[in-house]
Swiss-Prot record:
Annotated Gene Ontology cellular component terms: chloroplast; chloroplast membrane; plastid
Pfam families registered for this protein in UniProt: DsbD_2 (PF13386)
Function text: Together with CGF1, essential protein which supports female gametogenesis and embryogenesis, probably by securing local energy supply.
Encoding gene per record: CGF2
TM region(s), chain numbering: 109-129, 161-181, 195-215, 231-251, 281-301, 309-329, 352-372
Source organism of the structure: Arabidopsis thaliana
Residue ranges with Polar residues bias: 7-20
Keywords annotated in UniProt: Chloroplast, Membrane, Plastid, Transit peptide, Transmembrane, Transmembrane helix
Knocked-out gene: effects: Various vegetative defects, including reduced leaf size, dwarfism, and abnormal cell death. Plants lacking both CGF1 and CGF2 are impaired for female gametogenesis and embryogenesis, and have abnormal leaf morphology with yellow patches associated with an altered chloroplast integrity; this phenotype is rescued by sucrose treatment.
The name this protein goes by in its record: Chloroplast protein FOR GROWTH AND FERTILITY 2
Length: 372
């Protein structure tokens, strides 16, 4: 009767019951409550609830009341529902741990790659750098060589052109020989006379240059110079005489019935004058001063530069002579309209200059000096 009047909480529990071996269910719940994902307060509550529930399950007594069993069942159900709820902190920790592992693995890969690069650098880099440097040096040398060659060719060409112009215009025999032939002519005729004379001069220089290269030691320069100077003097005398003859001739009246015949006669006369001009240019070119064209071309470092100098020297001679004769012909044509008989006077003057220069050249040979 006394046991029925005492409350259930006052019942004493034998110590032997606490020393009994725990069941597997108790171990499982204790392990689940020890996880780090639960907060500290909730962890303590779950431990208490699970211990109480396990205690009542392992130690059922006939003295326990139905209310106590119901309360324990309610506590067990609430603990199960709390454990089944998802925890967002747990997911975040999983993600953060995965990212940390990923970062560590990427760092390891970078570290291994750096070590491999350091180990392979002395083996692979020097041969590659040497091949690259060789290719760069060879390409740079080719580019620099091409630029130097182009510069050398252009410089030689312009030098030859100006040398030909100066050589032609600075020779008194050239000017004296072409003046009588170009006075009283139109611009086109004067240009043709100058170009023919320039081509003949170039041909004579080429002939002399080839003879010099072929014969060399056998070629006596002094003998050729002496006789060449005399021939030039004689040609000047002939040109002067022809100019005086042309100036002294009176113009004949033109007849209509004989117009075709006169035209044919004039064209034949022009052909003869053209051939004479070309031949005069050859004679003036067959002089030792042709070495002024040959020797610089031979002294240049490359054959291309020498060829460019030679070609431009010849072109400069033709252009200079054509320009000179066009200038003289244009001046005579312009003065013809204002001053009557100016053509005859200019022809007389230029012919006398040519004759005087020819005589001076020939006579100077006998006195031991040369004007040419």
């Amino acid at each position: 009767m006394d046991r029925l009047l005492q409350p259930p909480s006052s019942h004493s529990i034998a110590p032997s019951k606490f020393q009994s071996r725990p069941s597997p269910l108790l171990l499982h719940r204790l392990h689940s409550t020890n996880l780090s994902t639960f907060p500290s307060s909730r962890r303590l509550e779950s431990r208490r609830i699970s211990s109480i529930s396990c205690f009542f399950r392992q130690n059922p007594s006939p003295d326990t009341s139905p209310g106590l069993n119901q309360s324990s069942n309610f506590l067990i159900a609430s603990s199960q529902t709390d454990a089944s709820k998802p925890n967002p902190g747990f997911i975040q920790r999983i993600v953060s741990s995965f990212e940390q592992r990923k970062t560590i693995s990427a760092g390891m890969v970078i570290l291994v790659s750096a070590i491999a690069a350091l180990l392979l650098n002395p083996i692979l880099v020097p041969p590659a750098f040497a091949s690259f440097q060789t290719a760069t040096n060879s390409g740079g040398a080719a580019v620099v060589g091409g630029k130097l060659l182009r510069t050398e060719v252009l410089t030689s060409a312009w030098t030859g052109f100006f040398a030909g112009c100066l050589h032609t215009l600075s020779g008194p025999d050239h000017l004296a020989a072409l003046a009588p032939l170009s006075i009283g002519r139109t611009r086109m005729e004067s240009a043709a006379v100058g170009a023919l004379w320039g081509c003949g001069h170039d041909a004579g220089q080429l002939i002399f240059g080839l003879l010099f290269l072929l014969l060399k030691d056998r070629l006596h320069i002094e003998v050729i110079r002496t006789w060449g100077t005399r021939v030039v003097g004689l040609t000047l005398l002939v040109i002067g005489a022809m100019g005086i003859k042309e100036a002294s001739e009176m113009p004949e009246p033109c007849v209509v019935t004989l117009e075709n015949g006169e035209t044919d006669e004039k064209s034949l006369k022009k052909k003869k004058i053209g051939f004479a001009t070309f031949a005069t240019g050859i004679v003036h070119g067959l002089q030792p001063d042709a070495l002024m064209m040959v020797l610089p071309a031979l002294a240049l470092p490359s054959r291309i530069a020498g060829a460019s100098f030679l070609i431009m020297f010849l072109i400069g001679t033709v252009i200079a002579m054509g320009s000179y004769t066009v200038f003289i012909g244009s001046c005579s044509e312009a003065l013809k309209e204002k001053v009557p008989r100016i053509t005859e006077k200019l022809t007389w003057a230029s012919s006398l200059v040519a004759i005087g220069l020819g005589l001076a050249i020939i006579v100077s040979q006998f006195f031991g000096f040369s004007l040419y």
